[in-house]
Amino acid sequence: TLRVVLDDPEAMESFTHAPGQVGQLSVFGAGESPFVINSPPSRKDYLQFSVMQAGEVTAAIHRLSPGDKVGVRAPLGNFFPYNDWKGKDIFFVGGGIGMAPIRTIMLHLLEHKADYGKISLLYGARSPRDMAFSYELEDWLRRPDLDCTLCIDAPFEGWEHKVGLIPNVLLELNPD
């Protein structure tokens, strides 16, 4: 997870984005890549990005230290049409680092829960160690206003949730 604070406090305070939009992060000397802004729009003190190390730019991001400078162009791209979802039940399905954009919209919907119907999440990963945002998932499992189902691909000692591939667990849940 990378947290970015803009140099200009006024720009940071006035920055707006919608759930699902991305930011183009530039690491000087390494290049640039787009990443989902996964802090909720209500967060005004920093922008958060989840970066899985997979290439030169992401490796450079993983080598950053607090206070290092990066370039940011944001917000970019489309966003979730959450205003169209008001009053409706919503079911999210995601896996691995694909949780990054889902997390953003989930945080927004949970902040405005009264505007939406039932919110459900099916999230899976290869193993418990591969679960993104595990600290929040534990909180979400305890929320009475959220139906959260977690799964991993294969049995793992101590795992108390579903075991199986996401499509198979989805069939088992049989959402309407």
Go through the PLM ranges and name each one:
Residues 56-176:
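FNR/FR-type flavoprotein reductase catalytic core
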Residues 1-68, 125-127, 153-155:
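Ferredoxin-reductase
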